[in-house]
Amino acid sequence: MIQNPLAQPSRRRQRQNILLAFLLSLGAVAAAYALLGFAPFGDGTMLTGDLNGLYVAYITDLWRRVRQGGLGYSFAKLCGGSTLGLFAYYMDSPFNLLYLIFPVRAIPYVAQGVFALRTALTGAAACFYFGRHFRSDSRLLPVLSLGYSLCAFCVVYSQNIIWMDVVLLAPLLLSAVDALQDTGRHWPLTALVLLAALFNFYTAWEVCLFSVLYYLYRWFSAPRRGFWRLFGRFAASGCLGAGLAAFLLIPSLLEVEESKGGLFAIDFSLAPTFNLAQLPYRLFFGNFFWDDVTGSLPNLYCGVFAAALAVLFFAGAFPRREKIAAALLLAAMALSCWVQGLNLIWHGFKEPVWFPCRFSFLLSLFLRTLAGRALLAGRPGRRALLI
């Protein structure tokens, strides 16, 4: 929520904060590369899992087809077929244009550069959202943003590059929801839903679902008149954005349904997916195990101090309605991770194979938002935020 409705933050300082968030995330990735001996600081690369076994092959195929022709059709697909679904689901990212600039043998190293650039832009987007959401130009915001750009989801699931563009857009989309409620402007929301749907419709579905919960959270925290009128504008903006992307969405969905099979098969069950007592552990420990990919627990870690601040938010002197709204949203997200049927809805009504709770980055973003609310009210030391 807005930290101080009378505050008038400096736009110049806000822009500086966005740049600082970009540089801070970029520097953190560069430091990790240096410590791990990744190029250009060593001979290692970050190619692992699906990035190495799947996406490098797709990017190489795209690189060759751009130069040799045949973008819409390939004989390498079974006995030949359309590549529209493959492009829309796996390759529809503006960052992939960077691969086309360099020789094909440089793809492993370009992938590392793309990860660093995308992470830096994700931090900048989060800082933009925090600055607008809190109406603040505090120098703590770039550090707060780092916890989102390098949260457990962004690091562990970074090998699935198809999801990361929408992870970048998520803070901007929430900022657009704020703008709709505060000023009535709807075009930013329409534009961002369009971009998210074009970049990856699978993750866009998750962000759009969360935006509904976030809209209700904002409204319940500070109710005002005209709920149905404004909610109608919110729904219309989202539908318009998705509709503008229909030229790519509809044929792509049909092709993915044909190739993957059972895209819309529903097996709604209320069975738990994991022991609920394990969930708090994921907030305070960020160590990686292979079960993080193959198991069922969500990747929620976004900083120990951020999780502690989110807890302090509920003990702080904030409006009761705001705390109730935040608790309801957190409960809805926790149940979505825990209950199989709800989990299935978030994953497009198809059970995921590995990489569980692919929407958990949204929970990390909201936890950082609550942490920022408590942080800007109490202003603990900057060093504590990095814990």
Name each model-derived stretch.
Residues A28-G123, L146-V167, E206, V256-G261, ...:
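Membrane-interface coil-to-helix junctions
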Residues A21-S25, G226-L253, A265-F268, K323-M333:
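Hydrophobic alpha-helical membrane-interfacial segments at the cytosolic entry of transmembrane helices
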Residues G113-T122, M164-L172, C208, Y301-A307, ...:
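Membrane-embedded alpha-helical segments of multi-pass membrane proteins
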Residues T119-R132, R139-Q181, R185-F220, R233-L253, ...:
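Membrane-embedded helix bundles of polyisoprenyl
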Residues C302-M333:
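Hydrophobic, aromatic-rich transmembrane alpha-helices
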Residues N4-R11, R132-S136, D178-P188, Y217-R229, ...:
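Membrane-interface junctions at the ends of membrane-embedded or membrane-associated helices
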Residues L180, T203, A327-L335, Q340-G341, ...:
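Contiguous transmembrane helix-bundle modules in multi-pass membrane proteins
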Residues M1-F38, R233:
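Start-transfer (signal-anchor) and selected internal transmembrane alpha helices
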